[in-house]
From Swiss-Prot:
Protein name: Uncharacterized protein in dhlA 3'region
GO molecular function: DNA binding; transposase activity
BP GO terms, sorted: DNA transposition
Pfam families reported for this sequence: DDE_Tnp_1 (PF01609), DDE_Tnp_1_assoc (PF13808)
PANTHER family named in the record: H REPEAT-ASSOCIATED PREDICTED TRANSPOSASE, PROTEIN YBFL-RELATED
Length: 295
């Protein structure tokens, strides 16, 4: 299968995947561009940071020579109006299926993927009908390619627990680090990741209250002894100053819950201190990971 250069990897040509999407347009002499060409150009443009149809069309014109390496482009680059009209007509579920099929073939895993971040989001203003339930999505992001490589709809945030194993099963996890927020801090999830050859970084919160309390007390004692942390990063932007400090410790044989967590090697605490307009806020978050502590 031919490939094109993606954000940080060699990705498969999206055209064959998009050719499976039904074309909603009538067959007329005015239909100058194939649906798969339009969708493929738009995909490349969005991956390159374009965020409106005029920018997508401009990207196509600027990169036409490169695009012709894997797209016919029989009639050149569509106008921004054509992009907007086509995307307003296509079946969103068919597009979603084709996109995720393409992403699943994008060699996401192994040498290409270093980190996969799973994150649940409730879509704003998505309450449906009289039940008033919002649409909740579980996303899997490739941190290297900046791609949303998988997505699952879940009825409630609590159902992320059942969707996480399903998403993880889509990928080759060998050598990959999986980071998940607190709802994914489950022994079965840790086992699935390590048995597949991956590593995990799992956030701790109230769903593992005893473990969270033990880890937080231990790591805060370490922070009191070494207040500067083992690493520090400072970001300044428009009057906001954010300082992040991190503490890690792999001397955890004292932790009674350690045998229950497959592959657990290291405890982590991250402190985020934000200063804005004279106001200071500070948050500390704890994690468990199967990675060893850096020397």
């Amino acid at each position: 299968m031919s490939v094109f250069a993606g954000a940080a990897a060699m990705l498969p040509n999206p055209k064959p995947f998009f050719e499976l999407i039904p074309d909603p347009r009538r067959a007329t002499p005015n239909k100058l561009h194939s649906l798969s060409d339009i969708l493929s150009i738009a995909l490349c443009a969005v991956l390159s940071g374009m965020d409106d149809w005029e920018a997508v069309a401009e990207f196509g014109r600027t990169k036409e020579g490169w695009l012709r390496q894997f797209l016919p482009l029989a009639n050149g680059i569509p106008s921004h109006d054509t992009f907007g009209r086509v995307f307003s007509l296509i079946d969103p579920e068919a597009f979603e299926a084709a996109f995720f099929d393409w992403a699943a073939h994008a060699r996401i895993g192994g040498d290409v993927l270093d980190q996969l971040a799973l994150d649940g989001k409730t879509v704003r203003r998505s309450h449906r009908g009289s039940a008033g339930r919002a649409l909740h999505l579980l996303h899997a992001w490739s941190c290297e390619t900046r791609l949303l490589v998988a997505q699952r709809r879940v009825d409630t945030k609590s159902n992320e627990i059942t969707a996480i194993p399903d998403i993880l099963s889509l990928f080759d996890l060998r050598g990959v680090t999986i980071s998940i927020d607190a709802i994914g801090c489950q022994k079965a999830v840790a086992r699935q990741i390590t048995e597949a050859g991956g590593d995990y970084v799992l956030a701790l919160k109230g769903n593992q209250s005893a473990l969270h309390d033990d880890v937080r007390l231990f790591m805060e004692t370490q922070a009191d002894r070494h207040p500067q942390g083992q690493a520090e990063a400072v970001e300044k932007d428009h009057g906001r100053i954010e300082t992040r400090r991190i503490w890690v410790n792999d001397e955890i044989d004292w932790l009674t819950q350690k045998p229950d967590w497959p592959g657990l090697k290291t405890l982590v605490m991250v402190e985020s201190r934000r200063e804005l307009n004279g106001q200071v806020s500070c948050e500390r978050r704890c994690f468990i990971t199967s990675h060893t502590a850096d020397p």
